[in-house]
Amino acid sequence: MKKISIGFTNKSFRKDSQFIQEKVYNGMNHQIDYSILSNFDFVPKLISDSKEVIIWEWIEGSNVEITAESLEKIAYQLREIHNSNLVFPPSNHAFRVEQYLKILAEKGIKNPTIEKYNPFINEILVNMDKTKPLHNDLWLMNMVKKDKKIYFLDWEYASQGDIHFDLAYFIESARLDDDQEKIFLNFYGKLNYKLILLHRIFVLYLIILWVNAQETKYFDDTPYMEKLDNLYEQYKLWKE
């Protein structure tokens, strides 16, 4: 069994054609009934699931690159999730913010960007929809391409929520440029772009919050803080 250095929370291994994950709980993850994901043909086959360990079919594929074709597939698959009417766990978005803020307070970390946007983020949390099934963690590293298919992996944070959050999360985590974002959203379908913008701000805030709450700061959050400020200025102009 070979250990895999992937993800930041669980302990992951590969054994032959199986992807084995020892679950590490943080109060926000592994709430979903993973068996319901068999409704989607872009999720690897679930072999077994227990409180301690989950085992998936190993997908031997390649990294997903941003092209018009891949953006189309990702958009269509997200739309399929959002329209599926599957019952996911209740929205965990406000709880995630509360928990990360608590950790920062315990560590004595004061981040000016986080403090500046707290009231604005709370307003987003109050008003966001909480009824649609979401992946909630769609980084490119949580996808794999094989035989013209793109598989979505790592569903541990899946919950009900606002579709604009899922879309914004992918836009920001994949660092789509303006043209790529437009292509992606056009493939998805009719949307309220003001809500996309609001949730892009929320996603950047959440990424900054998350990385500062970790025992090891895995990456520099400066680009995310600069992007957050930029999008907030865009939002203010939008309101005017």
Protein language model features and the residues they cover:
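Hydrophobic packing residues in well-ordered alpha-helices of helical domains and bundles
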Residues: 71-74, 114-117, 201, 224-228
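Active-site Asp-x-Gly
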Residues: 146-194
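Helix-rich C-terminal or lid/interface subdomains of diverse kinases
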Residues: 187-240
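ATP-binding pocket architecture of kinase catalytic cores
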Residues: 2-91
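N-terminal non-globular leader segments, chiefly Sec-dependent signal peptides
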Residues: 1-10, 113-116, 186-187
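An alpha-helical support segment within catalytic cores of ATP-dependent transferases
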Residues: 86-136, 140-141, 146, 228, ...
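A glycine-centered beta->alpha junction motif in the catalytic cores
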Residues: 52-67, 80-83, 99-107, 205-219
